[in-house]
Regions:
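Short coil/turn segments that connect the beta-strands within blades of beta-propeller domains
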Residues: 55-56, 191, 232-234, 273-275, ...
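Structural motif
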Residues: 66-71, 201-207, 243-246, 285-288, ...
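A short beta-strand motif characteristic of beta-propeller blades
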Residues: 37-42, 163-177, 212-219, 253-259, ...
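A short helix->beta-strand "capping" segment at the edge of beta-propeller domains
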Residues: 19-47
Length: 408
């Protein structure tokens, strides 16, 4: 009987959260329904550093400092705009040359961050690119908001459109040489965008784009990985050391801070409707954090290795791990299931009816019951980002391409 209390503690830990029992074994990933090619492939002008579905809209942050909104047009609009899109694409090349030159000079002239303020002011907004950002974003939008699908494969120019939201000026590396200001995370609330990017000497910075201008903030600590809007005046920052920081935009100061674990941060997801922040770590644990109450609700030990990606939608959750035997975990409120992908699962995604996770040579799509219904084959690409958009599954690696797989 002396072993009973530890066993009870273990049982409580396993069933923590929503009461779904965690299975002990994993199922295979084979399925006969295969998709061999993407329906569309969008080629961008730089590598994709982050790809997200924000309030039903697709956004891609690139390693050249540009943020694009990606739109999947209807068949009717595609047919109507095809000729116009092609003509615009023909004019785009010549226009971009002069516009990009002017934009680069204008941005660089006004993008310097004021480092002469005291330490308190350094936490607040460092600089605001009010007029230059608005003007340059407008100029570049006119040249870059094309409906051209720039891939040689499966090219349908008027089906996919991209809209430039803003473009950051170049940063400088340790040798004072110009480099792209990589945008590596982004969130949106209303018409405000919060994003993380690499500034000079690879210093990570926070930016907020609203009303045609960008306000830059010094981050309160190094190693910030993710940003989420809590409200219009507050963002939640997640650190590599599994820190949660509430950052007040008006004062530039941290209003709340909590460290979840000593393990490094893995993937994260925020269900704004429920106020639940899902955070994972290298120890294979996921944490359910109540963003409104600012307290930890529960945690689950799911994998034996680090977790790369998580997704949360209502009572459904997925996690992708480096655990070779239990690579992917899925629960739908009634039951849970592990999948053995025989490879690290770098990305997972959920829609109201489906789920998806990467495998070594492609992607698997599951229904709400956890049954694999589609198998997407890839050549040599590694997919780091997955999301659902209408009847498409959308994915990208750290390259110039965004893939659109039709699911109907």
């Amino acid at each position: 009987m002396k072993f009973l209390p530890p066993l009870l503690l273990c049982a409580c830990f396993i069933y923590a959260g929503n009461g779904v029992a965690i299975p002990s074994d994993a199922v295979g990933i084979d399925t006969p329904a295969k998709i061999k090619h993407a329906r569309f492939i969008l080629e961008l002008d730089a590598n994709v550093a982050v790809l997200k579905n924000l309030n039903g809209e697709i956004y891609a942050g690139l390693d050249n400092g540009k943020l694009y909104k990606i739109t999947i047009n209807s068949a009717e609009n595609s047919a109507r705009n095809s000729a116009a899109g092609q003509n615009f694409a023909d004019r785009n090349s010549a226009a971009n040359a002069s516009i990009n030159s002017d934009a680069a000079q204008n941005f660089n002239a006004k993008a310097s961050v004021n480092s002469t303020r005291d330490s308190t002011a350094n936490s607040a907004a460092v600089n605001s690119l009010a007029n230059s950002t608005a003007a340059n974003s407008t100029k570049q939008n006119s040249a870059e908001n094309s409906t051209a699908l720039n891939s040689a494969r499966n090219s349908v120019p008027s089906t996919i459109s991209k809209t430039l939201i803003f473009a950051l000026p170049s940063s400088k590396n340790y040798l004072d040489e110009p480099m792209g200001a990589t945008i590596f995370d982004v969130d949106k609330l209303g018409e405000k965008y919060a994003f993380l990017y690499n500034g000079d000497a690879f210093e990570k910075m926070l930016g907020v784009f609203a009303g045609g201008k960008i306000t830059h903030y010094k981050l309160p600590m190094t190693g910030i990985k993710n940003v989420y809007f809590y409200d219009e005046n507050t963002v939640v920052l997640l650190g590599l050391g599994s820190e949660i920081l509430y950052f007040d935009l008006s004062s530039g100061k941290v209003s709340f801070e909590q460290k979840l674990t000593i393990a490094s941060l893995g993937g994260s997801a925020y269900d704004r409707s429920s106020g639940t922040l899902l955070i994972s770590c290298e120890g294979g644990i996921v944490f359910y954090f109540d963003a409104k109450a600012k307290k930890l609700m529960s945690q689950k030990s799911l994998h034996k290795d680090g977790i790369y990606s998580v997704a949360l939608l209502g009572d459904r959750m997925m996690s992708g791990s480096n655990d070779k035997e239990r690579s992917c975990y899925y629960e739908n409120g009634d039951f849970a299931k592990f999948y053995n992908a025989h490879f690290a699962v770098f990305a997972v995604a959920l829609s109201p009816e489906l789920g998806a996770f990467t495998v070594g040579n492609g992607v698997r799509v599951i229904d709400k019951a956890g049954e694999i219904v589609r198998s997407i084959e890839l050549d040599n690409d590694i997919i780091n980002y997955l999301l659902f958009a209408g009847e498409y599954l959308v994915g990208s690696g750290y390259n110039r391409y965004i893939y659109f797989w039709g699911l109907k």
